[in-house]
Amino acid sequence: MTINDSVISEQGMCEEEQVARIAWFYYHDGLTQSEISDRLGLTRLKVSRLLEKGHQSGIIRVQINSRFEGCLEYETQLCRQFSLQHVRVIPGLADADVGGRLGIGAAHMLMSLLQPQQMLAIGFGEATMNTLQRLSGFISSQQIRLVTLSGGVGSYMTGIGQLNAACSVNIIPAPLRASSADIAHTLKNENCVKDVLLAAQAADVAIVGIGAVSQQDDATIIRSGYISQGEQLMIGRKGAVGDILGYFFDAKGDVVTDIKIHNELIGLPLSALKTIPVRVGVAGGENKAEAIAAAMKGGYINALVTDQDTAAAILRS
């Protein structure tokens, strides 16, 4: 959901101003939603929906000032063990939407890292799109420029489609994977593709998801149809434990050689990704622990957002 500029005739305010006023009354003045609805002449349902919209767009940010917020012990250990610049570990919660909660945590981290008019490079995947959905208001207000790290326009639309129309987004106009290495080479040398790849490498901050070979059918790269189950089995037999942007690496963090898809991908290679100053990985699930650890060992990410159980599994591995 995004905050639009529709004017509410009773108050003469745009929707974003309504959200800001409701948030102030609710969080600072301690008014109930019923009291706010009476004061503004809105239904209680409308007040509730605008509060939710404010959270999802990033206009409303909740900050918990406690040393326990973010599972400090895990964050400290991960920073020390993997030389990370930034870590956010969200507390575990049974039966919760882990992907959505990781998106909130990653959005908060990015809002603290990005400066006005900086460039954010984004990778494909559920975790990164969950994050983007919660950044709409922030991206618009801070004039953050967005650029994709890979081809595959459809893979980005669940996040980009939620952004304000005024947001600056530069998308690689090509598929994630070409049908052959020759076609991939040709596409990457087209100016319209090359220019976006150069812009992505010049980004101030990047955010990427991390896939695990152990996920099998649940892996985004399989569900999206970029590799087959048979290919994944062969990749696993070559020692791969995880991937970022479709590039597979082993438990030490080294890119696995002699994998067909690597020559057919249209996107920023991991060696170029490492030149971006801040590289945030967002991933959760104990089955991803080995892949996340390998991504940190390889230096592909230097910041991490994960959940408590996954953090514990990483530190045990």
Swiss-Prot record:
Designated name of the protein: Transcriptional regulator LsrR
Domain of life: Bacteria
Function description: Transcriptional regulator that represses the expression of the lsr operon in the absence of the quorum-sensing signaling molecule autoinducer 2 (AI-2). It also represses the expression of the lsrRK operon. Acts by binding directly to the lsrA and lsrR promoter regions. In the presence of phosphorylated autoinducer-2 (phospho-AI-2), LsrR is inactivated, leading to the transcription of the genes.
Pfam family for this entry, one: Sugar-bind
Family according to the record: Belongs to the SorC transcriptional regulatory family.
Single Gene Ontology MF annotation: DNA binding
Species assigned in the record: Escherichia coli (strain SMS-3-5 / SECEC)
GO cellular component, one term: cytoplasm
InterPro entries: NagB/RpiA_transferase-like, SorC_transcr_regulators, Sugar-bd_dom_put, WH-like_DNA-bd_sf
DNA-binding region: 33-56
Subcellular location: Cytoplasm
Activity control: Inactivated by phosphorylated autoinducer-2 (phospho-AI-2). Phospho-AI-2 acts by binding to LsrR, which is then unable to bind to the promoter regions, allowing the transcription of the target genes.
Keyword line: Cytoplasm, DNA-binding, Repressor, Transcription, Transcription regulation
